[in-house]
Amino acid sequence: MSPVINLPEVLAEVQAVFARYEDALVNNRVEVLDELFWPSEFTVRYGTGENLVGIEAIRAFRTARSPVGLGRTLMNTVITTYGRDFATASTEFHRDGNSAGRQSQTWVRFDDGWRVVAAHVSMINSSR
């Protein structure tokens, strides 16, 4: 049986938690970011200069990073839900200046809510 794609109520939930994540990211609300990542050794976040495996590595990165220059504008955001408990979120972003990037997240609904289980952030070469 195939999962139903983008059930309206599930899509609304993931859109809301994605917006909460984005607000926490640009405002450096580390406690919210920590809450929204699955607290597991299996959680993965590949960034522009770091490969983080496990929630402890992700927490250490978030705590140590500079809170300066986190603002960004999102473009071409696509959120897709698969059934009631799985979703992906992909977006492009632009920061002040010319830097541009992309972000992908995999979300799973657990008993305590939606959590990111895998994330990837990369920059786009502006000379293209």
Regions from the language model: what does each represent?
Residues T88, A100-R128:
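Short beta-strand edge/turn micro-motifs at domain boundaries
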Residues Y21, L33-D34, F42, G54, ...:
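Hydrophobic pocket/interface hotspot
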